[in-house]
């Protein structure tokens, strides 16, 4: 899926929400701190959701 190749985007806001993104270099879903606005499709609420869509 295309969203799995998008880069991690923290965004400009300061909410500090724990999310997961698919790291195409390692082939794994990795946690990161999301700012709460901006961003892209490679931003999942749970590890399970990330793995399900990106097949990690």
From Swiss-Prot:
Q: Does the keyword Transcription regulation apply?
A: no
Q: Which residues form the BPTI/Kunitz inhibitor domain?
A: 4-54
Task: Identify the SMART domains for this entry.
Answer: KU
Concerning PANTHER family, the annotation shows: BPTI_KUNITZ INHIBITOR DOMAIN-CONTAINING PROTEIN (PTHR10083:SF374), KUNITZ-TYPE PROTEASE INHIBITOR-RELATED (PTHR10083)
Further remarks about this protein from its record: Negative results: does not bind to and, hence, probably does not inhibit serine proteases plasmin, kallikrein and thrombin. Has no activity on Kv1.4/KCNA4 and Kv1.5/KCNA5.
Function text: Dual-function toxin that inhibits both serine proteases and voltage-gated potassium channels. Has potent activity on both trypsin (Ki=50 nM) and chymotrypsin (Kd=1.6 nM). Shows inhibitory activity against 5 of the 7 potassium channels tested (rKv1.1/KCNA1; IC(50)=12.6, hKv1.2/KCNA2; IC(50)=181.7, hKv1.3/KCNA3; IC(50)=29.7, rKv1.6/KCNA6; IC(50)=43.9, drosophila Shaker; IC(50)=114.9). Has an anti-inflammatory effect in LPS-activated macrophages in vitro, specifically reducing release of TNF and IL6 but not nitric oxide and reducing expression of IL1B precursor.
| Name of the featured protein | PI-stichotoxin-Hcr2g
Which species does the entry assign this protein to?
Radianthus crispa
């Amino acid at each position: 899926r295309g969203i799995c190749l998008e880069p991690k985007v923290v965004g400009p806001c300061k909410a500090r929400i724990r999310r997961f993104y698919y790291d195409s270099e390692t082939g794994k879903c990795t946690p990161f701190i999301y700012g709460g606005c901006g961003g892209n499709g490679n931003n999942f609420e749970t590890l399970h959701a990330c793995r399900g869509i990106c097949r990690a």
